[in-house]
From Swiss-Prot:
The keyword Signal applies. PROSITE patterns: TAT. The gene is msrP. It comes from Escherichia coli O1:K1 / APEC. One of its GO terms (molecular function) is molybdopterin cofactor binding. This is Protein-methionine-sulfoxide reductase catalytic subunit MsrP. Belongs to the MsrP family. It catalyses: L-methionyl-[protein] + a quinone + H2O = L-methionyl-(S)-S-oxide-[protein] + a quinol; L-methionyl-[protein] + a quinone + H2O = L-methionyl-(R)-S-oxide-[protein] + a quinol. Heterodimer of a catalytic subunit (MsrP) and a heme-binding subunit (MsrQ).
Amino acid sequence: MKKNQFLKESDVTAESVFFMKRRQVLKALGISAAALSLPHAAHADLLSWFKGNDRPPAPAGKALEFSKPAAWQNNLPLTPADKVSGYNNFYEFGLDKADPAANAGSLKTDPWTLKISGEVAKPLTLDHDDLTRRFPLEERIYRMRCVEAWSMVVPWIGFPLHKLLALAEPTSNAKYVAFETIYAPEQMPGQQDRFIGGGLKYPYVEGLRLDEAMHPLTLMTVGVYGKALPPQNGAPVRLIVPWKYGFKGIKSIVSIKLTRERPPTTWNLAAPDEYGFYANVNPHVDHPRWSQATERFIGSGGILNVQRQPTLLFNGYAEQVASLYRGLDLRENF
């Protein structure tokens, strides 16, 4: 696996600069109440920088045993741990970037059951311990690109999804893989209240083509920064598909089902003209309400000196994955 393009050391966010009280920052910048009345997604390019509590906690899960294969270690400077665990989209716990860190402690992740079913010869059920012990874990340093045009670099820990699927033995009828998040409204306030949860239909669902799911880059992720995932990052297990926008990285997965037909996906159901099934990172295909040509790396300059950088096709993984989409119109199949 060849190394990808890398970012400058100056783009790494210092531990002390990112989390500031929203009211203080908005007042300092003279942002009016009218700006705050814009639709949530319409000001993703602006307000997502000003949300949050003072210092959401860094990951505090148990330490994991894992290897660091050279193929997945690179020159990408890491986004600090407190930013990775404190600046999240997980609408089941609220719309604000700091809400998941503040509210996700209510999620019970042990015991846990993950079922693999559908078009497979050998259906499987994994428990909480299986997720960290059944497969050799490895650390992979990946870019993470949100559809809101901000990005991070994260040292995820997990195992390739294809290893799990191989155990289940997909049949010749399997063409797609459908994923589902836990439905637990008593633990997830966004599932209980449509206002808190952004009006989405829950449980959250996602999907991939089978060849995408079997690609070596696609990771079943159980840890970050050497420890088990914290709830706000999708504990105990989430999906990471680094060449796709972050909303494809479904969190807190309880079901994986192989299917003949393309499965529904949450954001495509909510706004099909804005969020496609493929969701490949593409600087040439804009979101209807903002450009995808550049992105804001969570960096050391602070919110008053935000440095934008060009968005890379397939998030910098084109050499590895472009062949999956040969002959496919990426503008039409966004």
